[in-house]
Structure formats: C-alpha cells, structure tokens
C-alpha cells in the first residue's frame, strides 16, 4: 500500500469518527444551558446560598417566581433574611422590586421585621414603591411603626414614606 493511500485512509477515518465527535462535544459544552439546582431559588436566597442563586440565574430560572403558600419571591427572602449581595444579584438579573406575595407584601415590606435598612435603600434606589400597600392597606412605614422599628420608620419617612391612616 502506498503512502498516499495510507494517508487517505487515515484522513477518511478521522473525518468519519474523531472530528465529528470532537465538534459535537465542543458544541454541546459551549451551548448547553446548565440545569437548575435542586434547591429552589427562593430557598437559596433565604439561606444565603449565593452560588446556588448564581446557578439558577445561569440556568434561566424565573427570578420573580413565588414559592410556597405565601408566594414570596427570592428577592422577598433575601430582603427578609438580610442577604444584601443576593438581593443585589437578583435585582441586576431583573427581579421585580415591587413583586407582591399572596397578601400583597413587597420586598420592601420584608425589610421591616429585622430592620434591613441597607436592603431597603437598595430596593428604593432601584424603583421600589416606598408607599406600597398590603391587601389591608398597610405601608412599610405602618409596619415599622407597628413593630417599634423607629430607625426604619424614620428612614421610610426620609424617603417619602407615608402612613395609610
């Protein structure tokens, strides 16, 4: 067998097997969307698991999806539990700063319980309605007054917050 024939046979083998497999593997690795993690995005936000939140964002998880019986979003959970970096990441990914739970609670309402002023400021800076109302008409300022969170009440007033009364 001549050298030219051997070379032609090797080239034919490469064209039929190795090259298509290599191209397919490269295409699949570069184009595939990773699956979402098993831990729900709102649970990851509640627990402060920023890497899992990032994995959800890479997988295309809906950042505004509400979870459980309350319908709280991942941003609600991050706000309530004081995870500022996660709140910022979610906002940058398009989370609705005025999303409402089943009873009308916004992420801004969620900041009141534990006096998460830094997150409240982040939400307001990104368009959160400072006078958003629950289904019973309470604003974040009303909650702050009711819970005795004087610093939060003062902060909301400084941002234009009003009482529903």
Tell me what each language-model feature is:
Residues 67-68, 101, 134:
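Ankyrin repeat boundary/linker residues
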């Amino acid at each position: 067998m001549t050298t030219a024939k051997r070379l032609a046979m090797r080239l034919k083998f490469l064209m039929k097997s190795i090259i298509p497999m290599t191209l397919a593997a490269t295409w699949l690795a570069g184009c595939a969307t990773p699956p979402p993690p098993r831990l729900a995005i709102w649970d990851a936000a509640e627990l402060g698991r920023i890497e899992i939140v990032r994995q959800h964002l890479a997988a295309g998880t809906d950042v505004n999806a509400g979870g459980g019986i309350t319908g709280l979003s991942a941003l609600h959970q991050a706000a309530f539990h004081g995870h500022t970096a996660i709140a910022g990441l979610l906002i940058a990914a398009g989370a609705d700063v005025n999303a409402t739970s089943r009873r009308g609670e916004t992420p801004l309402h969620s900041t009141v319980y534990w006096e998460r002023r830094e997150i409240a400021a982040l939400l307001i800076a990104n368009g959160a309605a400072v006078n958003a109302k629950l289904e019973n008409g309470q604003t974040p300022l009303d909650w702050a007054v009711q819970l005795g969170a004087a610093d939060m009440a003062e902060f909301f007033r400084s941002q234009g917050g009003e009482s529903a009364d």
